[in-house]
């Protein structure tokens, strides 16, 4: 393959790119973490010099009283944790003490400079590390931590000493050289601050103490709540994202409740973030637990919300227009006569634009509704086990043939269920054994399902991921595949992929990689051939907010992976986008472009076809770098094949499809 490139063309390209330099759109680079945190519910307010620090919905922002500017804080600008439990301004040290629910501590100046103080988080302590209160005395702060008092020097950011009192400490006060502690079991105790208070013998009960030791701490809340209540710090309204969908360029989420019995009675609202990052929160008449959503494929302003208790709600243009429940529809209550238990756990549209819903724990577990609002039930035998309906049918996904897959998340009969809306056939894949006929033991819940680009169906269970190959999908009797990952240690042995790890969410990116969210182990990214761990994100070593993952959704255009966690919503920019069906002139693009002299990061090339061959050559036609796209994206490090940074000039990106057909050419200008 040869290309004649004239000197004049190169000059014109360089000049054009230099003119574009000031207008280059800033793209988030792969590996960048972003946060979408709620600030809608003020919980604590601390006056700090010329501004207010506000803990709201468990997160932190600063409001400048002079210019009314708002600065939100998260991991991207220095914080070292997720949800906050307490904040307290230390006026003498000029720092805010911010304590997270995991007992990590950040000290923050009024200018936003953050110093991490992980001593308490890393300390080994008997009993709980739950912080009940922060009390300051000059530049010293006393933390009521479980049954202990932790004394810290705020100005110098270190722990001075710890006093253990034997029962929960609710409050402390330093008065006239004495330290008073309000404890759960021993009432008020006191010790002379000049004594060695590490020794429990130097503490004793007292009936003489400041009465205010019983007062609840309100800080500056009452003085400034009238101001704070008018502040819009942006972001979503709540931090609960039990399910996520990325549809038509918008992110949708419902808060819902977990089905493991741990977090029911959560928010009944649903939220939407548009392509510009603006959030819309929809207040609804629902009482609790919005758990699923279906957007009308013919009208994006028309959608339905399923609830775990109040039936089905219909919305148009963000306004509720109808409720379907027991008494006015085929929906029934799991507890006859009690309309607070009308459970709709899953929703989906078929290709005929009919709405399907699951009605858990009733004799009509699957119902569909046409565009006129007429409902009919589909009481297929596969929806029942020993005469009892499958209990929790949820999290539907549609495969490339139009068939719909759901999970049954109850130990009564855990399985995958497949529905063919064209024929009304239902199959229950309940043969819990693997490809070697080995029984799959201790599985009590199927939690999520996703289809990869090879037509395999992936199921996340409480014991790890399982897969149904296209051949296994031909019959429910064929069992499942447990992926074996070679150890590559010369033994010839392998291990089952993520065996024993509870999988709660799954999504497939443009490169056919599996993003697997877990109950307590963060997020794994598995290669397209299923044998390599591409990445493992945890809250300890990445920007992930929490290791407890509830949902994952991917924007295939940008490669942004949205992750709903126990502590809120975050996203990481991946190096995979959806592949272009056909590479066309102008469709392949690179950024940053041009590449500035001080830039040393990755150069992203997008708009490629799946598994495209990518070659980067200089103006002389010499090969500089070569690789294959991940989905529609190829990442170039700006170096040649020997790892050396390339010189200034224009570099041509030559692409070809996976079957060898030539694609398009784009150019990258590099300025050293």
Where are the model-predicted features located?
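Bacterial Sec-dependent N-terminal signal peptides
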Residues: 1-33, 356, 405
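Glycine-centered coil/turn sites that cap beta-strands in beta-rich domains
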Residues: 582-615, 633-636
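C-terminal tail/sorting-segment detector
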Residues: 652-672
């Amino acid at each position: 393959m040869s290309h004649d490139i004239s000197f004049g063309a190169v000059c014109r390209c360089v000049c054009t790119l230099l003119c574009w330099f000031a207008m280059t759109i800033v793209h988030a680079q792969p590996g960048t973490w972003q946060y979408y945190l709620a600030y809608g519910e003020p919980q604590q307010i601390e006056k700090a010099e010329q501004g207010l620090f506000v803990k709201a919905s468990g997160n932190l922002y600063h409001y400048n009283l002079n210019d009314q500017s708002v600065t939100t804080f998260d991991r991207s600008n220095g914080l070292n944790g997720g949800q906050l439990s307490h904040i307290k301004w230390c006026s003498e040290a000029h720092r805010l003490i911010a304590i997270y629910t995991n007992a990590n501590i950040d000290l923050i100046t009024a200018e936003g400079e953050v110093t991490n103080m992980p001593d308490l988080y890393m300390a080994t302590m008997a009993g709980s590390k739950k912080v009940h209160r922060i009390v300051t005395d000059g530049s010293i702060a006393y933390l009521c931590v479980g049954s202990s008092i932790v004394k810290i020097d705020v100005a110098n950011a270190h722990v001075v000493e710890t006093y253990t009192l034997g029962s929960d400490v609710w409050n402390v006060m330093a008065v006239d050289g004495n330290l008073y502690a309000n404890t759960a079991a021993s009432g008020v105790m006191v010790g002379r601050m000049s004594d060695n208070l590490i020794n429990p013998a130097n503490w004793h009960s007292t009936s003489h103490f400041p009465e205010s030791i019983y007062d609840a701490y309100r800080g500056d809340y009452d003085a400034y709540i009238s101001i704070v209540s008018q502040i819009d710090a942006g972001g979503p309204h709540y931090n609960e994202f039990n399910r996520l969908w990325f549809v038509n360029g918008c992110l949708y989420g419902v808060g819902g409740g977990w089905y493991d019995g741990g977090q029911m009675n959560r928010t009944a609202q649903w939220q939407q973030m548009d392509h510009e990052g603006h959030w819309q929160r929809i207040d609804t008449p629902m009482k609790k637990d919005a758990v699923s959503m279906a957007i009308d494929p013919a009208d994006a302003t028309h959608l339905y919300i399923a609830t775990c208790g109040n039936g089905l709600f219909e919305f148009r243009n963000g306004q509720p227009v109808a409720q379907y429940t027991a008494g006015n529809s085929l929906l029934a209550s799991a507890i006859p006569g009690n309309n607070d238990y009308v459970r709709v756990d899953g929703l989906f549209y078929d290709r005929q634009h009919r709405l399907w819903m699951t009605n858990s724990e009733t004799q009509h577990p699957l119902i569909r509704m046409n565009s006129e609002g007429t409902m009919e039930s589909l009481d297929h035998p596969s929806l029942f086990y020993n005469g009892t309906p499958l209990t929790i049918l949820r999290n539907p996904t549609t495969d490339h043939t139009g068939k719909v897959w759901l999970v049954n998340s109850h130990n009564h009969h855990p399985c995958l269920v497949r529905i063919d809306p064209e024929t009304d056939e239902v199959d229950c894949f309940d043969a819990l054994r693997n490809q070697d006929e080995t029984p799959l033991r201790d599985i009590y819940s199927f939690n999520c399902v996703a289809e990869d680009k090879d037509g395999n169906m992936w199921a996340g269970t409480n014991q790890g991921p399982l897969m149904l190959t296209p051949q296994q999908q031909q019959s429910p009797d064929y069992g499942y595949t447990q992926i074996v990952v070679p150890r590559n240690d010369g033994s010839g042995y392998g291990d089952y992929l993520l065996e024993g790890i509870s999988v709660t969410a799954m999504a497939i990116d443009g490169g056919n990689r599996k993003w697997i969210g877990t109950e307590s182990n963060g997020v794994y990214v598995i290669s397209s051939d299923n044998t390599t761990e591409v990445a493992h994100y945890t809250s300890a070593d990445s920007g992930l907010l929490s290791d407890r993952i509830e949902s994952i959704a991917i924007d295939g255009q940008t490669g942004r992976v949205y992750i709903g966690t126990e502590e809120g919503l975050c996203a990481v920019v991946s190096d995979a986008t959806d592949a272009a069906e056909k590479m066309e002139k102008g469709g392949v693009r690179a950024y940053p472009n041009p590449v500035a002299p001080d830039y040393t990061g990755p150069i992203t090339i997008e708009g490629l076809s799946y598994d495209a061959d990518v070659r980067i050559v200089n103006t002389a036609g010499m090969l500089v770098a070569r690789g294959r796209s991940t989905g529609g994206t190829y990442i170039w490090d700006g170096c040649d094949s020997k790892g050396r940074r390339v010189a200034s000039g224009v570099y041509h990106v030559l692409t070809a499809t996976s079957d060898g057909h030539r694609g398009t050419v784009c150019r990258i200008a590099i300025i050293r």
